[in-house]
UniProtKB/Swiss-Prot annotation:
One of its GO terms (molecular function) is actin filament binding. Belongs to the F-actin-capping protein alpha subunit family. Transmembrane segments: none annotated. The modification N-acetylalanine is found at residue 2. The gene is CAPZA2. This is F-actin-capping protein subunit alpha-2. InterPro entries: CapZ_alpha, CapZ_alpha/beta, CapZ_alpha/beta_2, CapZ_alpha_1, F-actin_cap_asu_CS. One of its GO terms (cellular component) is cortical cytoskeleton. Keywords: Acetylation, Actin capping, Actin-binding, Phosphoprotein. The modification Phosphoserine is found at residue 9.
């Protein structure tokens, strides 16, 4: 092991450490970071070389953050990334600095985003917040309005998690929805993701995602937002139901097929009579 360590350059060590961090299960970033820190045994190298991994993890996970002085949390996503460690809170029209390692927001300041699309963004946000409140007890959503390739675009992100370390499991739901504002009809493109880690007496992870695309009639802001929520609700319900049904099927068939209920002899061993069996006598004489 020592020989292998000597063969690895600092760059290779950081690359390996970064992969561990990026793939940390939801709610377990600190545990993975501390383990990697012990393995690398070089804090400066880890902080400088793997800083991009800290940021990528938070962006990928839709990490929610509370900004002092503001009631609602905001999600850390690529759509709100303003560069130089600053992020956008479109609801409160502010930008703030975000520490990817400590997961803390500081220095909130006023920020004016795309005013031309703000009425659409606000309508979608109002409808989405009501939906998230109803379906996700711990849910957070952030809605962005921006120009992409010259087209006015709405991007809605949802995150909800349950971290139960004392019960040896953590899980996170994420979904992202995007559509452009075009006359008559547009397409809603969505991606839904579930990640769950269970680690009591074992180590099992569920990592699943689904891509969707549905037509959305475009009229006024409020009505379009209502139709958008119908699409989101239908797709998320269908995905969650499919996951549940698939797990039931796996429980009834796949998992049971992994081992025999009886040994090859088709008979169970009576452990109280083990000494009368041939194997018991052989063990006794050994």
């Amino acid at each position: 092991m020592a020989d292998l360590e000597e063969q690895l350059s600092d760059e290779e060590k950081v690359r390996i450490a970064a992969k561990f961090i990026i793939h940390a299960p939801p709610g377990e970033f600190n545990e993975v970071f501390n383990d990697v820190r012990l393995l690398l045994n070089n804090d400066n190298l880890l902080r400088e070389g793997a800083a991009h991994a800290f940021a990528q993890y938070n962006l990928d996970q839709f990490t929610p953050v509370k900004i002092e002085g503001y009631e609602d949390q905001v999600l850390i996503t690529e759509h709100g990334d303003l560069g130089n460690g600053k992020f956008l809170d479109p609801k409160n029209r502010i930008c703030f600095k975000f520490d990817h390692l400590r997961k803390e927001a500081t220095d909130p300041r006023p920020y004016e985003a795309e005013n031309a699309i703000e009425s659409w963004r606000t309508s979608v946000e109002t409808a989405l917040r009501a939906y998230v409140k109803e379906h996700y007890p711990n849910g957070v959503c952030t809605v962005y309005g921006k120009k992409i390739d010259g087209q006015q675009t709405i991007i809605a992100c949802i995150e909800s998690h349950q971290f139960q370390a004392k019960n040896f499991w953590n899980g996170r739901w994420r979904s992202e929805w995007k559509f452009t504002i075009t006359p008559s009809t547009t397409q809603v493109v969505g991606i839904l993701k579930i990640q769950v880690h269970y680690y009591e007496d074992g180590n099992v992870q569920l990592v699943s995602h689904k891509d969707t695309q549905d037509p959305l009639p475009v009229s006024n802001e409020v009505q379009t937002a209502k139709e958008f929520i119908k699409i989101v609700e239908a797709a998320e319900n269908e995905y969650q139901t499919a996951i549940s049904e698939n797990y039931q099927t796996m429980s009834d068939t796949t998992f049971k097929a992994l081992r025999r209920q009886l040994p090859v002899t088709r008979t169970k061993i009576d452990w109280n009579k083990i000494l009368s069996y041939k194997i018991g006598k052989e063990m006794q004489n050994a």
